[in-house]
Amino acid sequence: MNDHVDVVVIGGGSAGLAAAVTAAREGATVRLLERHGFLGGMGTASLVHTFCGLYLLRKEPDAVLANPGFPSEIAGRMIVATGQGPVRMGRVDVLPQHPVEFVRIADELVAGERSLDVRWHTEVTGASCDADGWEIAWSCRGQAGKTRASAVVDASGDAVLADWIGGSTEMTESPKLQRPAYVFGIQSVEAPGDPLTLAGWLVEGVRAGDLPPTALGLTFRASGRPGESFGTLDLTGAEQQEGYDPLDPICLSRLEVEGRKVASAVVDFLRSRANGWQRAFVSHWPARAGVRESRRWVGESQLTGADILSGRRFEDEIALATWPLELRETAKGAKLRFPEGDRPAGIPLGTLRVKGEDRLFVAGRCLSCDHEAQASIRVMGTCFATGQGAGLAAAMRANGGEMGGVIERLRPVF
């Protein structure tokens, strides 16, 4: 099964969804390859239930969207779907989202674009490039095919294309990698309870040996649906800090089992002790644990943590990074570092262009940045913005356009 499109997008998470829809709206024929049976990535498969990075950091009470276009559109759709607007949490504004609604919204967005073809349950199995463009090999349950494309967007989160083309990538050493998240659904919680009271119960459980130490970082949030809550754990990812490898199948398998085991133990423990939890039970598991950091491409330019903290701006910027450095290098919760004066930083187009590959663009958490900057740009609100940039750039490149047009179209207004 072989055919040709203008743009292939690999991965249908926040960045890939934005890239595919944006490229299609630009008039390109697009094929989106997604390994799950639904789109949304971390926001659906991993049940991450908050859009972070959509809004500017500001002391004033009203939330202000940082990036126009696709990020603003999907925020508006989610507000209508859930009936929940942005919420101030400490110094940041976030938008609660529900994974079920995110799947529905993504379905509607791709169905609205005639030139966009989605292939679910499909994994990339090879790639090559010549003067005329790309050939991407893929497989779906044993059925193999190849798709020719003039340009490609890697929004896989793990820079998967590098396995076949030998592109330049980097990954932070294991002890410093952001620890993975494990989010699960809980039903029949009649009264979630005060967070400090619940934290006290968890401390007691760990001290008594009834719960593992990783339970200490667990947080709960009501989903907005009757009796439903989400629990979020930070996991070590390995028995030893240096043993975590988010690209290793054995490590990933261990991670899934660890998440389910800890979540089950916590809910059982609270059901026997905490008021309002007597009828609570785990209602659903994520399709996969939430990997926060893995392999990144080396691009024409690299965004750094220092750039984020100083609010640095660039001549070729196509989006704004507005989330603080959210460092989760242990399973003990986040360490937040905010930029000077809460200033946004620019995200250069060069970070979305792979060094030495004229027709390859990247978006989401695998774009060109260092470990610290990735702790900011990996959140879904920013992924919508970088996906939009990569999708527009790929569509314009496929049709012979110049990259200056991308910068002109997407230059931030703030």
Regions inferred by a protein language model and the residue ranges of each:
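Beta1/beta-strand and adjacent pyrophosphate-binding region of the FAD-binding site
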Residues: 2-13
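Short, well-ordered alpha-helix to beta-strand connector turns
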Residues: 5, 27, 149-150
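N-terminal Rossmann-fold NAD(P) dinucleotide-binding loop
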Residues: 16
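Conserved N-terminal/central alpha/beta ligand/cofactor-binding core
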Residues: 22, 28-29, 34-126, 179
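Flavin (FAD/FMN)-binding glycine-rich loop and adjacent Rossmann-like elements that form
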Residues: 42, 143-151, 155-414
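Conserved beta-strand-loop-beta-strand element in the redox core of flavoprotein oxidoreductases
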Residues: 128-146
